[in-house]
């Protein structure tokens, strides 16, 4: 499989660009690492943490305020769909959910950027503390706090991987930190 060519039985034939999906997992990872590195480089540790928290809260506000009345956190009601479609075009959006929706679209990427920032902060913490039980204890506590916070936030902002909600970011970051700590 390739997004640009296909095998017709005898030759490689170029595919039409009309329906090529532009964003995917690897593109999202690249965007997240780029923006997270810029935030960390210019904001340093405290600034990166602050920017990350602001992004998660603003994303929550945007999902609620700009989403469809009654169901702003569903695929159909999520505010990012029309924006991603306007930017990318409906032919370049993933359609596997029954509605044109891109799980790696531009509008759900900010919360994923914060997850990369958290990864940096955890790595920095591990380097600072060194390999010892205090470091592991700190990771376990942080992991439990974040997992619990994400779980509680789910009551008002559902954990939803498809739109990469802020509660999903906090919850899964907590689980990842717990895994590292174990």
Task: For every predicted segment, state its role.
Residues 1-182:
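Alpha-helical transmembrane segments and their immediate juxtamembrane cytosolic regions
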């Amino acid at each position: 499989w390739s997004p640009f060519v296909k095998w017709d039985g005898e030759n490689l034939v170029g595919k039409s660009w009309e329906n090529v999906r532009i964003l995917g997992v690897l593109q999202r990872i690249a965007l997240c690492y780029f923006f997270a590195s810029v935030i960390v480089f210019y904001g340093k540790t405290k600034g990166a943490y602050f920017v990350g928290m602001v992004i998660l809260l603003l994303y929550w506000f945007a999902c609620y305020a700009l989403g469809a009345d009654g169901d702003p956190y569903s695929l159909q009601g999520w505010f990012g769909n029309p924006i991603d479609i306007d930017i990318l075009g409906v032919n370049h959006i993933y359609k596997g959910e029954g509605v044109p929706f891109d799980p790696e679209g531009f509008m759900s990427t900010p919360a994923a950027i914060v997850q990369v920032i958290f990864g940096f902060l955890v790595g920095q913490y591990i380097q600072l503390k060194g390999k010892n039980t205090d470091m592991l204890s700190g990771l376990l506590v942080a992991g439990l706090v974040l997992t619990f916070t994400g779980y509680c936030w789910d009551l008002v902002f559902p954990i939803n991987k498809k739109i990469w909600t802020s509660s999903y970011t906090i919850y899964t970051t907590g689980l990842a930190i717990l895994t590292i700590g174990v």
